Amino acid sequence: MLISTSRKPSQKTRQFCKNLSHVFGCNYVNRGKMNMRDLLLKALELDEVNLAVVNQIKGNPSRITFYSNKGEELLTILVTVSVSSSRLNIQPSKLKLVSKVDELDVLSNIFNIELKPTATENYILISSLKDEDNIAKISFFNKFGSKCDLQIYVKKIL
């Protein structure tokens, strides 16, 4: 997967994209003046299957849209994030997905990681939330089984 941003991303958005690229072991490019066609061509050039574009509102990551390398929109989620400035210690090759939210099970196909019912280390946990603002929380656990600072709160699935 290739991860990119909207144009002129804030420092927090760039840090979030770098965190995601470290977690999934994928490429991250600053969008700059590239349009969507250029981003899709860049993904093909790097042999990436999917593209994730992170958009921001007032300097904070607010939406992640996933595209296939043919330009088809696969999924869009509205998010709030907390980024990590410390080392994540996640091994992308051994990453697993544990999902308690059926609508987000598709992320295992998008990220090309195995969907498991449970895990103890090196996994992503998608849990359901019952508060008024968020419907799910995506938490990241490192190779030691410890929770990372990186969190994604899903407000809405489009």
Locate predicted features:
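Phospho-regulatory, Ser/Thr- and acidic-rich intrinsically disordered linkers and terminal tails
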Residues: M1-L158
